[in-house]
Curated annotation (Swiss-Prot):
InterPro entries: UPF0367. It comes from Synechococcus sp. (strain WH7803). This is UPF0367 protein SynWH7803_2240. Belongs to the UPF0367 family. The lineage of its organism: Bacteria, Bacillati, Cyanobacteriota, Cyanophyceae, Synechococcales.
Length: 87
């Protein structure tokens, strides 16, 4: 399972959707990344493959960052990748 996580302006918690296949996750990551590069505010709608019916709409002008990572059973889902202030 792959997680695509979005950091939003003025929001301390990221939002995320999940994809089962790496190719699908990579395609979604590239779609969000290109929306960030364009800089034109538009509505981006995402859906989650793990939680059926979970849909997310976000205004691209409120996106700050996007990251993709593999969610493994071994990690327990407690520590996300990236920078952390916790020791």
């Amino acid at each position: 399972m792959y997680v695509i996580e979005l950091a939003l302006r003025m929001s301390p918690m990221p939002v995320s959707v999940q994809r089962k296949e790496h190719d699908s996750a990579e395609a979604l990551y590239q779609q969000v990344r290109s929306a960030l590069e364009q800089g034109q505010p538009r509505l981006l709608e995402l859906c989650c493959e793990k939680v059926e019916g979970k849909r997310l709409s976000v205004l691209t002008s409120d996106l700050l960052a996007v990251q993709i990572y593999e969610k493994t059973a071994a990690s327990g889902g407690t520590k996300r990748p990236g920078f952390s202030f916790e020791a």
